[in-house]
């Protein structure tokens, strides 16, 4: 309240920003007459001079130079747009362009021309000579926007490319990313980054830099999708019958008897009775014994699948598959799967074929991907409600841009009914009234299920209408475009065709414009504002109103008891409603509660991902060093050899051979043979002094003799490729271990420990272990490299060629599947008796190798404690 009063007196922070930008608008407008007089060639030459000026300065001074040339750049871009696109940027669009250039979020209402606004900042920032990425929510918008704006960019001397899911050829993607301006979806940009860090050549990496990105519908991408990481994964063996058995057990359990449901936190708590029933049905004496951990996990997921996730709301079943419905956009999330076995639990619930669980091979969140950019900005019609999150997570400030024409839409108070049936009856009556007079109406629903309920009611009343939900997503743009026609009735879920304008005829404007009916408040005010924003574009008339009931999820779970109390006191009859600002405010307060819960959830996830992200950056940086032909890989191998030998000798009783027992010398001899393929005589070890120097020189000479047939280029390539494979495999194993750590870390809270602190500690120790494992495995592998003919370098070339072919084939596989089905094949012939970290330990303990002898050493011999 106090903040609002101060804002009215001295102006808000947003007002002050707009005031500053308006001064620059005057400078840009003053240049317009000059550029209007120029010929096309003169205009293009003037723009080229600006490019030269920006590129002539040091990189750290380029941002400052961009600000200096901004008025000329914007004025030329506007003039070029007038000539090429027949569209002139309004003053408010110039302000939007400046906001984007400053690395902020421009909040611009629907129909204000965000696509055209972006051209100002894109054309300016592309002067630096690094690709500018324009990020959209789907392939349709990426293709549409790039094709519409390409003639303007070409006039200014820029090349334009579009990355979509249909571009599958590596060379074609590489060519597109070489363009000055690249349009694409957030998914494509993110997956390409992950793929780049699985490539075995710097030349094959498509994303050369992360200089500047403009994210369209920034709230959808950076807020709504922030909880969903991008993952490239491979299959993991699991017993498929466990999913079906867990589903049977879950279906036999009773709510409030065997388990309780916490709707607010979307969790299920099993009671003592439920545990006993599950143990009886599974045939185990203790569900929570370590050997039954998989069963208890499957049961947890089966209960969630059966009692927290609902068909036509959270997912649909199509073509014998469970397909996720995005809760914020209402779109189908094709190719995306719930993690931790939940998707398999849903498949068991619906009786469709169960697909294997997967192991993460590479992953990143949108939060950490977009935070890599030197400069990031965004556009949307709805950002202010999430301004705090944008600032805290992305360091992005939100600037609300004034509309070019005043908004004429009327936003009416909510109408609240006692039951859902009464609410829908009232909605149908209103639709009939509007349809009879010819005023178009767009009805927003929160789920596919509700949209189809409304569809059935309208069909019963014989009111012609069109339904837009995830099941009809292919016609999205066409359906939304026609929603403003006279007499049109359109039912839409949250997807509501973002990025597609609903244009009105003069006749429809006379009838009052597009009428928006919301049949339920979403958990986020922003989604409601997006629905409202479909009406009243560019000064058009329009109306919006929400119809609610006490049975709506938001009011039932989070709503204030005050609303229920008011309705009970009023003694409303069937079909009657209440309408008041007090009630509307109470509903918005409920939404704020949920928004805060989601924000804390996203922030919490980011805190965990930040730990992995620092490790990811270190690994990817080292990976790039290995890909660099100038990197001294031989020095790295020598360093690893020293480290590995230090690990061996640190376990010996003494460094002087005179104090080593015969058993220890024999153990050392065996280790050198088995792990490093080095044959030494026992008597040579007995004579050697100091022994560590003798062993180090032996390993080095064996390796040098093996590699001497190769020229320096061949040797460097083989060493880099083998090291990369070791690094990649170890990183994948590390991600698997980190996934397992994250899954169980919250249990530390029961021991009065902060799970996040514990996660940071353990993940750091795991990372140190990873680095050590890589060094030891690298020197072991290099020691075992064997060529069929060590005097013939062509043998090494064949290995390199075969490796390149395997990698090329594999890259196509994971581009289609977003998964790798097999481990990489080593590019050289190697042999090893050392098991992989996740294989059973050869000592017979039944544990994984990494949890047994990899840590403690063999039970007998050299590494005995």
UniProtKB/Swiss-Prot annotation:
Annotated GO CC locations: cell envelope Sec protein transport complex; cytosol; plasma membrane
GO molecular function terms noted in the UniProt entry: ATP binding; metal ion binding; protein-exporting ATPase activity
SMART domains named in the record: SecA_DEAD, SecA_PP_bind
SUPFAM superfamilies from the UniProt entry: Helical scaffold and wing domains of SecA, P-loop containing nucleoside triphosphate hydrolases, Pre-protein crosslinking domain of SecA
Binding site for ATP: 93, 111-115, 501
Membrane topology field: Peripheral membrane protein
EC number: 7.4.2.8
Protein keywords: ATP-binding, Cell inner membrane, Cell membrane, Cytoplasm, Membrane, Metal-binding, Nucleotide-binding, Protein transport, Translocase, Translocation, Transport, Zinc
An annotated GO BP: protein targeting
Keyword Glycoprotein: no
Keyword Repeat found: no
Annotated cofactor note: May bind 1 zinc ion per subunit.
Cofactor requirements of the protein: Zn(2+)
Pfam families on file: P-loop_SecA, SEC-C, SecA_DEAD, SecA_PP_bind, SecA_SW
NCBIfam families (UniProt xref): PRK09200.1, secA
Name this polypeptide is given: Protein translocase subunit SecA
UniProt source species: Helicobacter pylori (strain J99 / ATCC 700824) (Campylobacter pylori J99)
């Amino acid at each position: 309240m106090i903040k609002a009063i101060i804002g009215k007196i001295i102006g808000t922070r947003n007002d002050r920003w707009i005031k500053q930008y308006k001064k620059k608008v005057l400078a840009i407008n003053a240049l317009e007459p000059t550029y209007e007089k120029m010929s096309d060639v003169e205009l293009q030459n003037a723009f080229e001079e600006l490019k030269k000026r920006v590129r002539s300065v040091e990189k750290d001074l380029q941002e400052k130079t961009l600000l200096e040339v901004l008025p000329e750049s914007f004025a030329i871009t506007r003039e070029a747009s007038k000539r090429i696109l027949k569209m002139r940027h309004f003053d408010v669009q110039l302000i939007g362009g400046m906001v984007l250039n400053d690395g902020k979020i421009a909040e611009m209402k629907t129909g204000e021309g965000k696509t055209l606004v972006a051209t100002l900042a894109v054309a300016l920032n592309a002067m630096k000579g690094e690709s500018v990425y324009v990020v959209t929510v789907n392939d349709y918008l990426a293709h549409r926007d790039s094709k519409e704006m390409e003639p303007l960019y070409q006039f200014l001397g820029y090349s334009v490319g579009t990355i979509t899911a249909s571009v599958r050829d590596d060379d074609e993607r590489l060519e597109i990313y070489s363009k000055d301006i690249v349009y694409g979806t957030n998914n494509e940009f993110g997956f390409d980054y992950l793929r780049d860090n699985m490539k075995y050549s710097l030349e094959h990496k498509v994303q050369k830099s992360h200089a500047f990105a403009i994210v369209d519908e920034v709230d959808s991408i950076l807020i709504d999708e922030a909880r969903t990481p991008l993952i490239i994964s491979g299959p993991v063996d699991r017993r498929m019958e466990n999913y079906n058995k867990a589903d049977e057990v879950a279906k036999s359990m009773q709510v409030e008897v065997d388990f309780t449901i916490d709707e607010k936190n979307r969790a299920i708590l099993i009671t003592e009775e439920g545990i006993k029933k599950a143990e009886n049905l599974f045939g185990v004496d203790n569900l929570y014994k370590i050997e039954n951990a998989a069963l208890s996990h499957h049961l947890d997921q089966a209960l969630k699948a059966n009692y927290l996730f609902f068909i036509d709301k959270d997912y649909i079943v199509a073509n014998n598959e469970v397909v996720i419905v995005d809760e914020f956009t209402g779109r189908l999330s094709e190719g995306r799967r719930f993690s931790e076995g939940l998707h398999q639990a849903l498949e068991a619930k619906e009786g469709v074929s169960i697909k294997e669980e997967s192991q993460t091979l590479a992953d990143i969140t949108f939060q950490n991907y977009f935070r890599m950019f030197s400069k990031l900005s965004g556009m949307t019609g709805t950002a202010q409600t999430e301004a705090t999150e944008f600032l805290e997570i992305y360091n992005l400030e939100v600037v609300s841009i004034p509309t070019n024409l005043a908004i004429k839409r009327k936003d009416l108070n909510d109408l609240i009914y006692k039951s859902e049936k009464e609410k829908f009856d009232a909605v149908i009556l209103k639709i009939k009234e509007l349809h009879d007079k010819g005023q178009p109406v767009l009805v927003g629903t929160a789920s596919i299920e509700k949209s189809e309920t409304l569809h059935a009611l309208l069909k019963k009343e014989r009111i012609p209408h069109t339904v837009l939900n995830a099941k009809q997503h292919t016609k999205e743009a066409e359906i939304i475009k026609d929603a403003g026609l006279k007499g049109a009735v359109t039912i839409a879920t949250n997807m509501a065709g973002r990025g597609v304008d609903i244009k009105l005829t003069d006749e429809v404007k006379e009838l009052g414009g597009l009428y928006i009916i919301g049949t339920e408040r979403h958990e986020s005010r922003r989604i409601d504002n997006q629905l409202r924003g479909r009406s009243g574009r560019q000064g058009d008339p329009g109306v919006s109103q929400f119809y609610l009931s006490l049975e709506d999820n938001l009011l039932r779970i989070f709503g204030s008891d005050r609303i229920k109390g008011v309705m009970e006191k009023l003694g409303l009859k069937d079909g009657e409603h209440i309408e008041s600002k007090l009630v509307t405010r109470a509903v918005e307060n409920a939404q704020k509660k949920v928004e805060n819960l989601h924000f804390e959830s996203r922030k919490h996830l980011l805190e965990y991902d930040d730990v992995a992200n620092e490790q990811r950056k270190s690994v990817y940086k080292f990976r790039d060093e290995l890909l660099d032909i100038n990197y001294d890989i031989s020095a790295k191998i020598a360093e690893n050899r020293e480290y590995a030998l230090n690990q061996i000798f640190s376990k010996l009783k003494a460094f002087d051979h005179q104090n080593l027992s015969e058993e220890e010398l024999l153990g050392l001899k065996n280790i050198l043979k088995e792990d490093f393929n080095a044959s030494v005589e026992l008597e040579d070890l007995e004579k050697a002094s100091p022994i560590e120097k003798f062993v180090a020189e032996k390993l080095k000479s064996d390796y040098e003799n093996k590699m001497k047939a190769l020229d320096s280029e061949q040797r460097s390539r083989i060493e880099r490729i083998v090291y990369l494979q070791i690094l990649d495999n170890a990183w994948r194993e590390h991600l698997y271990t980190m996934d397992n750590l994250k899954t169980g870390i919250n249990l530390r809270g029961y021991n009065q420990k902060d799970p996040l602190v514990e996660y940071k500690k353990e993940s750091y120790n795991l990372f140190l272990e990873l680095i050590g494992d890589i060094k030891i495995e690298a020197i072991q592998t290099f020691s075992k490299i064997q060529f069929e003919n060590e005097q013939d370098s062509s043998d090494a070339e064949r290995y390199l060629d075969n490796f390149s072919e395997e990698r090329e084939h594999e890259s196509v596989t994971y581009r289609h599947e977003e998964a790798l089905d097999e481990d990489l094949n080593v590019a050289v012939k190697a042999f090893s008796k050392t098991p992989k970290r996740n294989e059973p330990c050869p000592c017979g303990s039944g544990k994984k190798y990494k949890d047994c002898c990899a840590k403690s050493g063999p039970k007998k011999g050299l590494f005995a404690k």
